[in-house]
Amino acid sequence: ISCLTEEDYFHGNVDYLKQIRSKSDLPILRKDFMIEEYQFYEAKAIGADAVLLITAILDDTQMHDFYQLARELELDVLVETHDEAEIERAMKIDPRIIGVNNRNLKDFTITLETTRRLRRYVPEDKVFVAESGIMDDEDVRFLRECNTDAFLIGRAFMEAETPKMLAKKWKAM
């Protein structure tokens, strides 16, 4: 379960994560701009199992230090990238889970071709996650053909009449 906790841009809240934790034993990703050390301790304290590190907003030292801190706190880390250069930077910390965000941060357009194009830069022993723009069966099939291990899906579930049924359907594909 991915939970937005960033308040200013995405209207998330740490209380949302606490509420989810009280109702579910599934792993929870804290989705936020993780730029301060205290956020990692807070993530652990509120029940997160994983955090998001966004390569585009961190320098190499921050990436390394935050990754190490998260692992010391026994938090999994999804390292988010947007292009070849960011993947190269991310690989320096040898992450177990690496994601490609299909949203262009400059103009906010989304194309799943980003996942296809960048897949070859991520070693097969990494968990490869496609992020953003996954809206229907066709998108799921396309990303499976791209050898994607997992998906980070938000809007499609939020807009679905029965998100649980949609998740089961896509998992079975």
Task: Please give the residue ranges for each predicted region.
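N-terminal active-site wall of soluble small-molecule enzyme domains
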Residues: 2-78, 84-89, 115-118
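Active-site beta-loop-alpha junctions enriched in small/polar residues
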Residues: 6, 33, 56, 82-84, ...
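Conserved strand-to-helix beginnings and helix N-cap segments that scaffold or border functional pockets
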Residues: 13-14, 63-64, 111-112, 140, ...
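Catalytic cores of alpha/beta
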Residues: 35-47, 84-93, 130, 134-153, ...
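Glycine-rich phosphate-binding active-site loops on the catalytic face of alpha/beta enzymes
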Residues: 42-62, 100-107, 147-166
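Short, conserved beta-strand edge motifs with alternating hydrophobic and charged residues
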Residues: 78-81, 99-101
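Catalytic-face loop-and-helix region of soluble metabolic enzyme cores
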Residues: 97-153
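C-terminal helical cap(s) of enzyme catalytic domains, especially alpha/beta-barrels
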Residues: 117-121, 144, 159-173
